[in-house]
């Protein structure tokens, strides 16, 4: 069943891509807005950027963890051109009641943007479950689910143009950067993985990526085969440290197969797990990578920007760290070096 589903998805995306090519144009992913303006430098082959995620406070707090402020200030020493963020920028769904435009949610976004300004460079976010979901309680269970009103609020606060979905892409230098929305509201008929259960019997949503987004993503990858590097950033991981945190399995399998087709997809960066995990390697620090590569992309989980930390599984001691951190990417032509920068223990979360 899994193989048939995966084959069907890839076939539909391939047919859509071929049809677009025959018409002389590929459908484009929309431009993803940042916290500031980024001017592309098409000739640039040497630049640095930062990646991180999961800074959201505990409970329904407005105040951001000190870890976030430290990361945004400390990373300046690497002189990044911009920052990629893999979601959960606010406490979000724990604060969402019947009125999704509650002043607490607005205040949470305002505080995040105030902190983001400390970076001095634009930040680009792929949404997480805390921005997009609500909690529904019944006698039997408490379930987290995506919500249209939360999505609308996210689009408004993140200043997306009207009628634009919360995903997209942008170019810088020799590279393409793609933000995937793993938190789409699924149709009622969608069959999805079982979400993991956390504290107080809250069942988390496993995420969802629509066929429409998958088709646009496939077409965008095809249209950008000439780019030296493609970096993908998203919230739910395709290859997490713990299987219970994985993106909805059918979506994860389809995306992994799609990314493997394009040898210039260099890195896939996710969060959701509050830790660091090098899913592709056997060490904390990722190895240097050249593009194109038939080995497929390097998969990294970077969710240590301030949210309460998760523990690493016992079998991942060599390539997992339950630590606050951020990633530094240095692009030099066809080569990329990544450095994991740990936040000193003296920097307190609160």
What are these regions (language model features)?
Residues 1-4:
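Positively charged n-region of N-terminal signal peptides that target proteins for export
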Residues 24-34, 95-225, 250, 254-267, ...:
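Extended active-site neighborhood of metal-dependent phosphoesterases/phosphodiesterases
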Residues 17-21:
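Sec/Tat signal peptide C-region and signal peptidase I cleavage site
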Residues 339-349:
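Short, solvent-exposed aromatic-acidic interface loops
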Residues 7-16:
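Bacterial N-terminal signal peptides
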Residues 54, 87-88, 128-129, 235, ...:
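Active-site glycine-centered loops adjacent to acidic/histidine catalytic or metal-binding residues
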Residues 85-86, 90-93, 224-242:
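Short acidic, glycine-rich surface-loop motifs adjacent to enzyme active sites
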Residues 22-102:
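N-terminal active-site segment of His-dependent metallophosphoesterases
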């Amino acid at each position: 069943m899994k193989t048939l589903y995966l084959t069907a998805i890839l076939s539909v995306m391939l047919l859509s891509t071929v049809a677009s090519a025959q018409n002389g144009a590929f459908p484009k992913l929309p431009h993803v807005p940042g916290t500031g303006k980024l001017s592309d430098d098409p000739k640039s082959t040497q630049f640095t950027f930062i990646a991180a995620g999961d800074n959201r406070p505990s409970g329904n707090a407005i105040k951001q963890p000190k870890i976030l402020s430290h990361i945004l200030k400390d990373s300046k020493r690497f002189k990044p051109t911009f920052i990629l963020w893999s979601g959960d920028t606010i406490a979000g769904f724990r604060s969402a009641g019947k009125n999704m435009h509650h002043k607490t949610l607005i205040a949470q976004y305002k505080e995040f943007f105030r902190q983001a300004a400390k970076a001095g460079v634009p930040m680009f976010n792929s949404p997480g479950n805390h921005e997009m979901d609500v909690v529904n309680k019944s006698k039997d269970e408490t379930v987290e689910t995506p919500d249209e009103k939360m999505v609308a609020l996210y689009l408004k606060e993140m200043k997306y143009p009207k009628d634009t979905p919360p995903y997209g892409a942008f170019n810088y230098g020799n590279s393409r950067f793609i933000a995937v929305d793993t938190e789409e509201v699924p149709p009622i008929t969608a069959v999805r993985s079982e979400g993991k259960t956390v504290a107080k019997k809250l069942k988390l949503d496993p995420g969802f990526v629509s066929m429409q987004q998958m088709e646009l993503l496939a077409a965008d990858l095809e249209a950008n085969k000439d780019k030296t590097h493609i970096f993908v950033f998203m919230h739910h991981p395709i290859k997490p440290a713990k299987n219970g945190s994985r993106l909805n399995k059918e979506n994860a399998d389809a995306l992994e197969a799609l990314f493997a087709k394009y040898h210039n997809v260099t890195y896939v960066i996710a969060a959701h797990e509050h830790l660091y995990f090098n899913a592709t390697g056997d060490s904390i620090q990722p190895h240097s990578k050249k593009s194109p590569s038939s080995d497929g992309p390097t998969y990294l989980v970077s969710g240590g920007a301030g949210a309460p930390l998760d523990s690493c599984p016992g079998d991942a001691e060599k390539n997992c760290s339950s630590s606050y951190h951020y990633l530094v990417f240095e692009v030099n032509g066809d080569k990329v070096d990544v450095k994991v920068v740990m936040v000193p223990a003296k920097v307190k979360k609160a």
